[in-house]
Amino acid sequence: MASTSRLDALPRVTCPNHPDAILVEDYRAGDMICPECGLVVGDRVIDVGSEWRTFSNDKATKDPSRVGDSQNPLLSDGDLSTMIGKGTGAASFDEFGNSKYQNRRTMSSSDRAMMNAFKEITTMADRINLPRNIVDRTNNLFKQVYEQKSLKGRANDAIASACLYIACRQEGVPRTFKEICAVSRISKKEIGRCFKLILKALETSVDLITTGDFMSRFCSNLCLPKQVQMAATHIARKAVELDLVPGRSPISVAAAAIYMASQASAEKRTQKEIGDIAGVADVTIRQSYRLIYPRAPDLFPSDFKFDTPVDKLPQL
């Protein structure tokens, strides 16, 4: 029951059985409840009061303190939309029982495609613990490629995966193709193709990867001590300087250097353990290791403490 006070132009909701009771408002459900008898006096009540809070968190992640998502500047309309709740009264339905007011988001097909790609990018980045700046750069790269329409015929998931790979390289935290493949549904070959096409389409480039780009992460994932990591880094760098590994990928050289350093220490790791982390096959590690093994005495740092002498290292 609603009664209007002379002192107040707005209707005041009261309990018909306890008109003087101060109603309790359930903000989540939008209900006005009488504390005396528990009667729900008003439902679907809208709070028309002023909102004095300031929202400084405009990240794309969910913010429980705001209504709806934050604005996305990469989309044409910022992804601002109106959500209509389900009706409860008879007036909310037509003669066939269907809701008269259906929730339709006024979003273009291109924005919808980009939104799906952005969600996929965020999911992939989260699975390999990449920071937000990588996600933002990837989203920007995808938007540029999508709007240029220069990769027509390529799946958006493949383009998104390649953009993530490029963003990692450009931000100085490179990931291998295998690592990107592991968190996407796209093959290494297809990501590689899109990678080359995107660089050409955007007329951009990425820095060449080196063994040092992966060494710290690989050794950390293998739970190797700092001494072994430093030795592996030194071995890989010297192998490149001495031109012992021409044509070999930095990842395979890094894996071989880690294998050599670990075998010389008390913290030994197998080729398979290293291969699983680096994303390379055992045979690939062996091929690079055989190239550097003959010069092993020249590759270790002078202060390295050997648990296994150089002449006792595996010959493979």
From Swiss-Prot:
It is an enzyme of class 2 (transferase). GO terms for molecular function: acetyltransferase activity; DNA binding; DNA-binding transcription factor binding; histone acetyltransferase activity; nuclear thyroid hormone receptor binding; promoter-specific chromatin binding; RNA polymerase II complex binding; RNA polymerase II core promoter sequence-specific DNA binding. The keyword rRNA-binding does not apply. Gene3D superfamilies: 2.20.25.10, Cyclin-like (1.10.472.10). InterPro entries: Cyclin-like_dom, Cyclin-like_sf, TFIIB, TFIIB_CS, TFIIB_cyclin, Znf_TFIIB. Transmembrane segments: none annotated. A zinc finger (TFIIB-type) spans 11-42. SUPFAM superfamilies: Cyclin-like (SSF47954), Zinc beta-ribbon (SSF57783). GO terms for cellular component: cell division site; chromosome; condensed chromosome; germinal vesicle; kinetochore; nuclear body; nucleus; protein-DNA complex. DNA binds at residues 152, 154, 189, 196, 248, 272, 281, 284, 286, 290. It catalyses: L-lysyl-[protein] + acetyl-CoA = N(6)-acetyl-L-lysyl-[protein] + CoA + H(+). Disulfide bonds: none annotated. Zn(2+) binds at residues 15, 18, 34, 37. The modification N6-acetyllysine is found at residue 238. GO terms for biological process: chromosome organization; DNA-templated transcription initiation; gene expression; meiotic sister chromatid cohesion; protein acetylation; RNA polymerase II core complex assembly; RNA polymerase II preinitiation complex assembly; spindle assembly. The modification Phosphoserine is found at residues 70, 76, 92. Found in a ternary complex with TATA box-bound TBP. Part of a TFIID-containing RNA polymerase II pre-initiation complex (PIC) that is composed of TBP and at least GTF2A1, GTF2A2, GTF2E1, GTF2E2, GTF2F1, GTF2H2, GTF2H3, GTF2H4, GTF2H5, GTF2B, TCEA1, ERCC2, ERCC3, TAF1, TAF2, TAF3, TAF4, TAF5, TAF6, TAF7, TAF8, TAF9, TAF10, TAF11, TAF12 and TAF13. Associates with TFIID-TFIIA (DA complex) to form TFIID-TFIIA-TFIIB (DAB complex), which is then recognized by RNA polymerase II (Pol II). Found in a RNA polymerase II initiation complex. General transcription factor that plays a role in transcription initiation by RNA polymerase II (Pol II). Involved in the pre-initiation complex (PIC) formation and Pol II recruitment at promoter DNA. Together with the TATA box-bound TBP forms the core initiation complex and provides a bridge between TBP and the Pol II-TFIIF complex. Released from the PIC early following the onset of transcription during the initiation and elongation transition and reassociates with TBP during the next transcription cycle. Associates with chromatin to core promoter-specific regions. The TFIIB-type zinc-binding domain is necessary for the interaction and recruitment of RNA polymerase II to the core promoter, the formation of a fully competent pre-initiation complex (PIC) assembly and basal transcription initiation. The C-terminus is necessary and sufficient for interaction with the TATA box-bound TBP complex and for the formation of PIC. Belongs to the TFIIB family. This is Transcription initiation factor IIB.
